[in-house]
C-alpha cells in the first residue's frame, strides 16, 4: 500500500510539473524577439570646454531642452528663477537692472557674479543680461564657481543658452500670443540647410504689454513696454575638420519703467494732518504718482564668429565677438 501511494504521488508531481515546463518553453520560444528601449530626447550641442556629459561632471546643474522651454513659456532669463533652485533674478522695473544671484552670490551694480553665454559668445555687460530669449534649443544653469573654465565674473555660476541648429532642424516656425493687459507677442523663425556644408537661420520678434500700473499724475500706463529684434546665423563647414559659426543679434526696447509707489505705514497715517500729502491714503504701497514718467530705451547688438578646428587628438576653438549697447534711462526720484 505504501509503494502504491509513493508511485501515485510521483506520478501526480510529474503531471503537475508538465504544464509549467511547457508554459515556460512557450515563453522562451516566443516569436516576438524585438526589444523596446525608452530613451530621453537627444540634443546635440558643441561644448569645447568640457569632455564629459553635464550629468557626469562633479557640479550642480539644471538643464532645459527646447520643448520644455516652450512649454514653460520662458521669455527671458528672469523666468528661469521659478524653476531653478538657488537662482534669482529680481524684477526692478525695467530691463536695465539685471542683477543675478546664484546661491546668494550676486552683484547689484558694476561687475556681475554670474556669467551668461549665448552660443559660446559671452554677454559682457550686466545691462544686457535681461534680454528677450527666443530661437533657443537648450539652456544650462551651472551652480557654483566656474572661473577655471570661464574666467572672471562667474563666481556664483554660469548660464549657457544654445540656439536651434539649422543643420539639425529645418522649417519655419511662427508663434502668436496674447494675454492680459494687452500682452501681445509674435515670433517667426526660418531654418534652412543649403547643402551638407552650409546652413542658415533667421528669426525676428515683436512683443509688448500695456502694463499693470497707472501713473496717478496723468493717467498713463506706468509700465508700458514695446520691443522688437532680429537674429541671423550662418554655419559653414568647408571640411570635416573646420567649422565656422557666425551670429548676429539685434534688440530694441522702449518701456515706461520704474513704476514705483510710496509705502505708507499705519503710524504715518495716524499722525498725518489734513494738509499732509498722506491724508486720505490707505496703508500699503501706493500707485505710481510721478510728474515725469520714468522710461528706459536700449539698443543692443551682439555679433560673434566661432571657429573650430578638429585635429588628430586635439581641438582648436576660437570665439571673436563684438557687442554694442546704447541706452537711455529717466527715473523720477
What are these regions (language model features)?
Residues 3-72, 79-82, 240, 303:
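N-terminal Sec signal peptide and the immediately downstream disordered periplasmic leader
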Residues 285-308:
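Outer-membrane beta-barrel transmembrane strand signature
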Residues 168-169, 177, 193-292, 325-333:
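Periplasmic-side early beta-strands and strand-to-turn transitions of outer-membrane beta-barrels
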Residues 98, 112, 125, 135-137, ...:
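Outer-membrane beta-barrel translocator/receptor signature
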